[in-house]
Amino acid sequence: MQMVISRSAVRDGLVAVAVVGSIALGAVGCAGGDDKAPKAGGEFVAGTLLCGGEAVSTEAAESLKVITGASRFEESDEDSTVEHAAKQLSQEFTSSVTGDGDICQVFAIDAVQSDRLEVTWELTGGPPEGEPAPKFTVLRMGERALAAPDAGVVQFACRNEKLLGSQPAHVDVGVERWSPKEPEGDPEKLKDAYATVAHSVSLAMAKELGCENNGGLQARPSLDPA
């Protein structure tokens, strides 16, 4: 049984878990059919073409293979892009310093409905505070990055007076596995993989938002613990 952690809980160092078991999967089944059936989709593409084609670097695509064991994935929907998410985020920031939304979902070839990666964004209202949950390793990227064997988060401050006004937007980009199975593989390699994917999407988001200095994110991920 896989335990998933909310974005706010990760940021605040609180472990708020939802058990993906028979009840949760039953809810998915009611909404979208048999969760154990193969995901009905269209074309399958390389990892670098996911989430709009600008979000996943070659290095991050290799990391997706470490996480899922696959190198081909269901093509993302038209609105499941960094460009679309950045527009949502900037619109949300004009009325509130907090909010969240989806960027895209990643289904490996032959994946079932209940086994996916969710890539999300969140406006946190301020820089990171407190200690993260024990499962996470803190990395030096942006304001703070967190890596676990089943999730990665990069937190950065975005300054763009034309788009966002005088106050910086504090953005979390998260990559999390929702699955009935426990993570498989070397935990440290999985941590690096999640951090790499989260960094790649975060950098794409920072560029799309026009953040000053790309939100403090470098061209490649920093995987050494802080």
Residues covered by each model-derived region:
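A small/polar (G/S/T-enriched), proline-flanked helix-loop surface module common
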Residues: 39-203, 207, 213-226
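C-terminal motif of bacterial Sec signal peptides marking the signal peptidase cleavage site
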Residues: 26-29
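Bacterial signal peptide processing site
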Residues: 31-34
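Bacterial N-terminal signal peptides that target proteins for export
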Residues: 2-17
